[in-house]
Amino acid sequence: MLAGVFCFEACDAAPRPTPDAAVRPDDVGPPERDVPFDVPPPRAFGPGFTDLTLPLERDAPFVIPAASREMFSTDELSPLVGDVDGDGRDELVVSHWPTDDSIVRGMPAPYAVYRYDRAARQFVRVAGARLPEMPPLAGILDLDGDGRDDLIALERSRALAWGEGAGFSQPAPLDARPSDWMMSSRILSYFLDDLDDDGWLDLLVATDCCRTPCTDLHALLRTGPRTFDERPDLLTIPQVSKPYAAFSARFAPGERVLMSVGWSCVDPNSAPVFYRSGAPDAAGYPRFAAFDPTPPRSYFRGEQLGFPTIAFNSPMAACADDLDDDGRLDLAVALNPVHQLFRGTAAWPFEDVTAAAGVPTTSADSGRAMIPWSMAFVDLDRDTRLDWIIAHGNDQTAWSDPPERFIGPQFVGAYQNVGGMRFADVTTALHLERRGQWRTLTLEDWDDDGDADLAVGGQQELPRLYRNDIDNGAHGVVLRLRGTTSNHLGVGAWLTVWISEGGRPLRRYVGGSAHPYVVHEPFVTVGLGGATRIARLRVAWPSGTVQELRDLAADRAHTITEPPSLVITPPSRHAPADGRSAVTVLVTPRDPAGALRADARVDVALAGTGTLAGPAVRGPEGWTARVVASPGPGTAVVTVRIDGVALAVHPRLWWD
């Protein structure tokens, strides 16, 4: 293993912009941008968030060096949530990335496992919990759709351990073939999305790319139940970067956009951050090219028109959701030190609303602007509006700042949505103001009461664990999706919620947060205000299936399963390349209630190798088509049309 694989920020080929070199609140934009607006006082929040970290502090599971100025590197401690023992209940795993070179030398990263005790309303250590020896963990989530959580780590050669029974398989590499992986440094982030619209979740991997030749953004397409294939040909990358996070979503103009959320060690003035999808290639795979959807007059540029690029301000995380319920994704990007906010538009570019939002930066006790890292949109107070939560902390450059520029301890900022895409700082009212250096966010519903609880990971100290005890008379629900024809986590689905029939609907997006170092299974929180039930819920699945449910009770979690409209047999989608073997395609058109639509018209088409053995035939469960394998290796893409409208997923078949 190369010594540079786990080199930290101080090893960069070029210095990152310091807070003074980055855009500052007092030199951004015309003066009228920073005129404060009248913000209604926040509601009484009751206890706010309750800190549950004491058991971890008493347990002291790790030896953590004390924080000090001019640190060469820092310990990262990340809270992760998932079922590590196969009992159907989630555990909390604290993953420790030490400052020493033990990880570089191939030693496994330490961890500690806890469980939330609902009776005691506190976390307790899980005695005897054992995980495979792996590098620092990035996530505990179901990667292959078999219902069992898997492990994914921040190092390519031992990245994946598949959940099996009450344990895990031996760690395996992401993909053994890419030649440029050895020239890339450590993995910094993962993002899950169906990049090629085949109904399977793929991996977008961000790596520390400060030593060319290397690639900063890796697209790994799923090619089987537990296999991924890197496709470097899908992205045209003109300038490599050091992304702290990777992101993917389909925005209102209809294009899927990938983000390499970072700056370039080579030239931060020219590094692209955004890539949009274009026409697919002859084999049906997507292609992505760099572009800039930011408006020329963006907050982060100050008075300069169209320059610098957003990469100059060191992007570190991103989140997207529909803040104004207009059916378009809005986007926030963590910059140094700006909380950059864009409103989604029908056509590029975005609209910059950073100043109007009211919280372009937040100051530490030193008076200097803090550095934002992870961020998320979530309805913390269940008032039906999406709030904004942002973790702030040092990067390596900030640790070595001279005393007159040192930011000092920072904190997690909580910003209440007061309407009109405006936000008010309610950090102290929610009791989230503990000082430290924070980088990662983990949202979870520890107690299954329908609101978002919080874990914050940082540097040189244990994560902070918080239970949402906001008491303002409002109610909410947590919604988790399980896709069948769509990807199994429902990433990319849109939810429309009617609290009352005929009322104004709320819109929520599934899978809109990208963090450094950690990846989580997505879920959605919906605040209902004073209502105790959802009158109607509409799920627009990535497959194109539209499902409706009614009368969902508040103050609990619900799991919504997609009625399957397309089933491939065998589920591996692989068959021998012998000219005889067949794959079966079952199409079941659904009405919004999930029932079979017997009056539908179904057509199945095939592109690539293999042969479609006649039109789809009607049966009791729907329409069935047979695809006969080609006599030689190859692939084919299935397109299904229902009443002339193509499903949005196109499964790929493999002949081996």
Locations of regions flagged by a protein language model:
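Gly/Ser/Thr/Pro-enriched helix-cap/hinge segments flanking short amphipathic alpha-helices
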Residues: R422, T428-W438, T442-S565
